[in-house]
Amino acid sequence: MNIYIPDALRDLLPPSLLEQCQAQTFPKGEKLFHLGKAPEYMFFIVSGEAVLSRVSGQGEATILQRCKGGFLSEASLLTDSYHCDAIATRAGTAIALPIKAFRDALNYEDFSLKWIKLLSKEIMRLRTQSERLGLKDIKSKLIHLIQTEGSEGILALQSDYKSLASEIGVTHEALYRAIATLEAEGILKKSPQALCLLKPKAIS
């Protein structure tokens, strides 16, 4: 097999699925799949970034999930159609797995248990995200994001600040104001590529 497959994926998939892995490169802006289309592949993001997005009745795009590494389309595994669009926000590479073969492989106990464990971790991540979205003010949402998604008080940005605003459910103008306020209060330091909490213990 001449394509690169991350160790996490090699450890998860049975040999029958590993043999069917296909590498797919994507530029920024490309749609990996479309809302309403019948699922054909499961996607595992190896590099770059993609988001799950759905447009509301008012024409506003909502980011449902941001993926910088891992599976992107778990919710569509057993459905008749994709429930959203998958859009690349940074160019990269994905592993595409035929969805029918993926479904068939779940009949094997070892793989099905590994898949359940992976989904359990994803549920925990979504609960953390829901907790963050439930916070009332933007500063609290931003601090929560850095504390839960960053490392040692530093959140490295994988895209731009406009994408970050969508991730926490606010406008980018409101995000910039919140960052400016936190910087003025000496709580946070902003750089083009990262946000750093200067007083993590005081606000934890």
Segments predicted by a language model, with ranges:
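Short, small/polar residue-rich loop motifs at catalytic or cofactor-binding pockets
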Residues: 18-19, 37-39
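Phosphate-/nucleic-acid-contacting segments
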Residues: 147-204
